[in-house]
Amino acid sequence: EDASRQYHIQVAKGEVGRYVILPGDPKRCAKIAQYFDDPVLIADNREYVTYTGTFDGVKVSVTSTGIGGPFASIAMEELYRCGADTFVRIGICGGMQPEVKSGDVVIATGAVRMEGTTREYAPIEYPAVANQEREAWSGESGSSRHRYGYSCSCRGHKKND
């Protein structure tokens, strides 16, 4: 094993960009990396696949996280140690509002923290809200297919809980 590489993601300092896109599914990494200029496969270890390239002249990366908060936490902590500091989680989800249609882009402005992982980082009372500067940037497209609102992550629960 190479001691300079992070244990789970197998990435070393400097191999990733400051900005990292985080899909859950490892197979999505290659698809996303196609939009980079000169993408390079950096690592492929378990559920963690990482590509780095440039986009509009900026070094960017994509790393899969697998499913769930604990796996995403591992990826982000190790990526941070390698120089990343801005993460965009992308993926699919279910919805409960009838006006949100399949294929709509939903940008979460906040989250209800009903799971266990984030409690290890901040008290449950601490609001999980988006960075307002980046949130404003994400809405620049003005598309009617973009939706803004809150998301909810929760541990498994029974219907009548």
Briefly describe each language-model feature range.
Residues 1-137:
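Metabolite-binding pocket within alpha/beta catalytic cores that recognizes anionic/polar moieties
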Residues 128-161:
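Active-site rim beta-loop-alpha module in soluble metabolic enzymes
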